Design a protein with these regions (language model features):
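Cytochrome P450
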Residues: 1-401
């Protein structure tokens, strides 16, 4: 029998202390989230991997979305899943998931993503060229955001002029906005993507990634318009949010650990491998996306009944002391392979190779040009985004040098 725990209102500002407490009590706890949603929160590494792959668990929001209302203390504040966006592979189980992922995976193999490196380097260099020693800037605004949004917009064939709209829509969709704000943002993005998908479908096929996806034909099977819109939404939001927050969180971690920053300045060849440690320590995603139990599930001796929302804390699993020694310490020389920052199993992040490449390029060029950058605000004044899903800062003020 578990005790229902109410998570504090400032949970997203300091989740690690909460996770440490919960993890010490057991692998999974029944909790009320700050906005009143009752979930079973998984905080241990081994049980997180089980929960992410268990056949007793489903990701189908069409069939399980009603649980968000059933388990909320304030059903009126529960955001509705935008129907246009629900049909992406993140919200489906096999065989529907298998079909959609097969069409997308081909474009995101490590080999194909590596072909993007020269263009990513070019975009990063252009952004850095616009910055100067002595500047005080929000690093997210001038660098961490424009780099990945430019890359993903080019892959999807979307004019870069729309990037500020996407940032605003994404913020509304991923943060604790009101249902009305979320619905308005979802409607605006859906309308834009419908127009974009229709235009590409009516145009002659070309060699761009999204055109290939629109016109892809697997043994007579093609994505329909709604599937393409939902897929574009997933790629657009996940394709930039992950890298924005990975860069921002990593820079903050380095500025708070100058000895580790010095190691990377002295040995920049360690940056690619250190990516895994940054993902482990302060990954860009707090919890895995929506899951619920179709059947009762045993997690480390705790039974989660059927019909419950299962929330897997990726950041908690990655700081489990049973899996990683000194888990709260940044160690850029650590072998952090096996972390679950990108998920685990069939829903492992398809864009992981692209996020890793963008991070490698961004950190290499940033530290080469501004090796002595410093934080331009007291760490305790920094505010994390008001989102259970995303782990990222509102702003990251730095002084370039």
């Amino acid at each position: 029998m578990t005790t229902l725990t109410q998570l504090p209102d400032d949970y997203v500002q300091n989740p690690h202390a909460v996770h440490d407490m919960l993890r010490a009590e057991g692998p999974v706890q029944e909790v009320h989230m700050p906005r009143g949603l009752k979930v079973w929160l998984v905080t241990r590494y081994d049980e997180a991997k089980i929960a992410l792959t268990a056949p007793e668990v489903s990701k189908n929001v069409v069939e399980g979305g009603h649980l968000m209302i059933a388990h909320s203390t304030d059903p009126g504040q529960v955001r509705k899943f935008e129907p246009t966006f629900s049909g992406n592979m993140l919200n489906l189980d096999p065989p529907d998931h298998t079909r959609l992922r097969k069409l997308v995976t081909k474009a995101f193999t490590a080999r194909r993503v590596e072909l993007l490196r020269p263009r990513v380097q070019e975009i990063s260099a252009e952004l850095i060229a616009g910055l100067n020693d002595g500047d005080e800037v929000d690093l997210l605004d001038v660098f961490a955001f424009p780099l990945p949004i430019t890359v993903i917009c080019e892959l999807l064939g979307i004019p870069i002029d729309n990037r500020d709209d996407f940032r605003e829509w994404s913020n509304q969709l991923l943060s604790f906005g009101t249902p009305e704000q979320v619905q308005a943002a979802a409607g605006s993005m859906a309308a834009f993507l419908h127009q974009h998908v229709t235009a590409i479908a009516e145009a002659e096929p070309n060699d761009t990634f999204f055109s290939a996806l629109v016109h892809a034909d697997e043994s007579g099977d093609r994505l329909n318009t709604e599937e393409l819109i939902s897929m574009a939404f997933l790629l657009l939001v996940a394709g930039h949010e992950t890298t924005v927050n990975l860069i921002g969180n990593a820079v903050l971690s380095l500025l708070q650990n100058p000895d580790q920053l010095q190691i990377l300045k002295d040995r920049p060849e360690l940056i690619p491998a250190s990516t895994e440690e940054f993902l482990r320590l302060e990954g860009p995603v707090n919890v895995a996306t929506f899951r619920y139990t179709k059947e009762a599930l045993d997690l480390g001796g705790v039974t989660v009944p059927a019909g419950e929302i299962l929330m897997v804390s990726l950041v908690a699993a990655n700081r489990d002391p049973e899996r990683y020694e000194n888990p709260d310490q940044l160690d850029v020389t650590r072998s952090a392979q096996g972390h679950v920052a990108f998920g685990h199993g069939i829903h492992f992040c398809v864009g992981a190779p692209l996020a890793r490449l963008e991070f490698d390029v961004a950190m290499t060029q940033l530290l080469a040009r501004f090796p002595n950058l410093t934080l331009a605000a007291e760490p305790e004044t920094l505010v994390w985004r008001d989102s259970t899903l995303i782990r990222g800062l509102h702003t990251l003020p730095v002084r370039l040098a």
